[in-house]
């Protein structure tokens, strides 16, 4: 079997992406099969550095309790839900939230 040699490029926690629409500061972006959080606002066609790992607070789907460690997804309204959709998981719940909660901490890309 051949040996493959890799050259270290970067830690991989930050990814720079092209903005195909205006991007808001801390906006959650789908980048291929992962999600990333914009580190700054940028205009359409600009480039923005995004966090591809870490724990972030996002709006949570109303009237849904989510337990710690549950795989979570983005629903059509832009809220975090435990109900799987057609998009990949955003990550896992990093906080336990009741149905009354309006936000949740999520460790992305886990």
Predicted regions and their residues:
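Surface-exposed, low-hydrophobicity beta-strand/loop segments enriched in small/polar/acidic residues
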Residues: 1-110
């Amino acid at each position: 079997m051949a040996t493959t040699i890799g050259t270290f490029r970067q830690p991989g926690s930050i990814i720079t992406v092209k903005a195909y629409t205006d991007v808001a500061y801390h906006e959650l972006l789908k980048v291929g099969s992962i999600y990333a959080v914009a580190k700054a606002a940028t205009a359409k066609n600009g480039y923005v550095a995004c966090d591809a790992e870490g724990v972030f607070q996002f709006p949570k789907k109303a009237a849904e309790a989510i337990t710690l460690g549950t795989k979570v997804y983005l629903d059509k309204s832009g809220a975090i839900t435990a109900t799987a959709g057609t998009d990949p998981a955003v990550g896992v719940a990093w906080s336990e939230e009741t149905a009354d909660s309006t936000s949740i901490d999520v460790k992305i890309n886990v």
